């Protein structure tokens, strides 16, 4: 991941030295060419590296140049798709070779791809539309090494503030990512939230489809909606209503349900 970035840094450094300037590692990393390289590499890695890129775009966006924040923001919902042959193999392992017979329709083109897996739309014979999340092969095994590689890139680039101890942050990232890769655990919490909120008018929670859910495939009913970030461009009353509901939900989770959805990725919310 660092080879192309390092080459571009070296070239830019020589150019600046030729102009009598004294470049820093951070200055050399931030030109748009390097930013695009980093974003593209993170998207292709499909695992912990891309997840950390997502967190960078949300958690440190105000501390980074707009160019870096904007490009990293693409990682919130976009990534390289799994090749069709690889997808077929994963679903054969999860559901058996004749899995297509269970569906009235299954779109092999993913609706979205993110850090841990990609999502496909499907339809059951009874008419229910589903969202099927398929985990990338080997992603759980690559978490530790990917987090280490991204940590090295952050240190090389000088993106971390002076004196900032990156180690505990990376340790926590590893722990959380291993939890996210556990789809059976996620299905348990999704079922719990459906029990708590699934029948309320103010919220729409997908319902689990347990007969199609495995350790690396998560099946749920499809709930249409717009990106929550697009609400920023809606009329004021719509923005107020969305904010009120989100704040009320957070308070109910903390003081009523005693269980919270703590992944801050905005791609997890629709309106």
What is each residue range found by the language model?
Residues 1-253, 258, 270-271:
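Broad phosphate/nucleotide-binding scaffolds in NTP-utilizing and phosphate-metabolizing enzymes
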Residues 259-266:
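Catalytic-loop of the protein kinase fold
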